[in-house]
Swiss-Prot record:
PANTHER family the UniProt entry points to: 4-HYDROXY-3-METHYLBUT-2-ENYL DIPHOSPHATE REDUCTASE (PTHR30426:SF0)
UniProt cross-references to HAMAP family, sorted A to Z: IspH
Protein's name in the database: 4-hydroxy-3-methylbut-2-enyl diphosphate reductase
Enzyme class: oxidoreductase
Catalytic site positions: E124 (proton donor)
Family under the similarity heading: Belongs to the IspH family.
Underlying gene: ispH
An example molecular function term from Gene Ontology annotations: metal ion binding
Hydrolase keyword on record: no
Binding residues for isopentenyl diphosphate: H40, H72, H122, S221, N223, S264
Entry keywords, A to Z: 4Fe-4S, Iron, Iron-sulfur, Isoprene biosynthesis, Metal-binding, Oxidoreductase
Signal peptide boundaries: none
Length: 284
C-alpha cells in the first residue's frame, strides 16, 4: 500500500502567521485570550491551551487586558468596542481575509450593495459583512438576490476566502443574470485565497491518481469540508480529524492512498496518520 501526500499540506501561510503571533504573545504575557477560536482545529487549540491561550466566545467574557482577534477577523464595530474597553488588541487576521474586508469596505463606501459568496454563519463572513456596513447579503444560493427587496442597481460581489473557485464563478454568472434586467452596475473582487486555491488544485490532481483519498482536518473547518467535496468528485474520500478516526475497512482492496489536509491541520497530526497507515501496511 503506497501513501502519497499532496504538494500543499499542513498549515497555510495565514494560519502559521496567526499561531506564531499568538505563541509569542502568550509567552510574553503569560497567557492570552482569543475572541473566538483562532482556527477550526481542535488539536491546534489544545496545544495552544497548554501555552496559556484561552478562548472566549463573547466580549463580556474577557477577563484580561489583552485579547487576540482570530485569523477569521472581525468587523469594525467589534474592534471599536474592544478598544473602547481599553483592551490591547492583538490582530491575527489572515492577510487574505483582510483583503476581503477592504474590498467590502470599498464597495460600501462607493454606495454598492455587497454580495458575499459564503456561509452566512461563518465568523469570517460575519466580519466581512461588518466592513460592508451590514448592508449586504451573504449566501451560497445562486438565486439569492431574488429574495432581496429593492436591491440596489449598484452591486459588489466578493467571496469568502476559502470557497471553491468554480463555485464562485458560477455564482457571479448567476448574479449577473439576475441583475442585468435592473440595469445594474456590477463590480467583482477576487477575494479567494491563493494558498487555498493551490491546495484545492493539488488535492484534486492527487485524488485522480489514487484509490482512496484522506482529508485531515477539523470537521467544522470550512476549507477542509471544501477539500472533501472536491476530492469526492473523483475518488473515494473520507474526512478524519485524527488517526484514531481512520477505519481499516476503508482500506480493503486499496493500493494507493492520497492525503491532503485543511489549512489549520498541524504537521504532527498528519505524521501520526501517515505512521498509522505505515504500520497497517507493514502488518499485511
Amino acid at each position: 500500500m503506497k501513501v502519497e501526500c499532496a504538494s500543499n499540506i499542513g498549515f497555510c501561510f495565514g494560519v502559521r502567521r496567526a499561531i506564531n503571533i499568538l505563541e509569542k504573545t502568550a509567552a510574553e504575557k503569560g497567557g492570552v485570550e482569543t475572541l473566538g477560536a483562532l482556527v477550526h482545529n481542535q488539536q491546534v487549540l489544545n496545544r495552544l491551551s497548554g501555552m496559556g491561550v484561552r478562548v472566549v466566545k463573547n466580549i463580556e467574557d474577557i477577563s484580561g487586558r489583552t485579547v487576540a482577534i482570530s485569523s477569521h477577523g472581525v468587523g469594525p464595530l467589534v474592534l471599536d468596542e474592544l478598544k473602547s474597553k481599553g483592551l490591547e488588541v492583538v490582530d491575527t487576521t489572515c492577510p487574505f481575509v483582510k483583503r476581503a474586508q477592504v474590498a467590502a469596505k470599498r464597495f460600501h463606501d462607493a454606495g454598492f450593495f455587497t454580495v458575499i459568496y459564503g456561509d452566512v454563519n461563518h465568523p469570517e463572513v460575519k466580519g466581512i459583512m461588518g466592513w460592508a456596513g451590514g448592508d449586504g447579503l451573504a449566501t451560497l444560493n445562486p438565486q439569492g438576490l431574488v429574495d432581496v427587496p429593492d436591491v440596489s442597481r449598484y452591486i459588489g460581489v466578493l467571496s469568502q476566502t476559502t470557497q471553491i473557485p468554480t463555485g464562485f464563478t458560477s455564482f457571479v454568472k448567476n448574479v449577473i443574470d439576475q441583475a442585468l434586467v435592473k440595469d445594474a452596475e456590477i463590480r467583482i473582487a477576487d477575494t479567494l485565497c491563493h494558498d487555498i486555491r493551490e491546495r484545492q488544485t493539488a488535492a484534486l490532481e492527487l485524488a485522480g491518481r489514487v484509490d482512496l483519498m484522506l482529508v485531515i482536518g477539523g470537521h467544522n473547518s470550512a476549507n477542509t469540508r471544501h477539500l472533501l467535496d472536491l476530492c469526492k468528485t473523483v475518488s473515494n474520500t473520507y474526512l478524519i480529524e485524527t488517526a484514531s478516526e481512520l477505519q481499516t475497512g476503508w482500506l480493503r482492496g486499496v493500493n494507493r492512498i492520497g492525503i491532503t489536509s485543511g489549512a489549520s491541520t498541524d504537521e504532527t497530526t498528519i505524521s501520526e496518520v501517515c505512521s498509522y497507515l505505515g504500520s497497517l501496511s507493514a502488518g499485511t
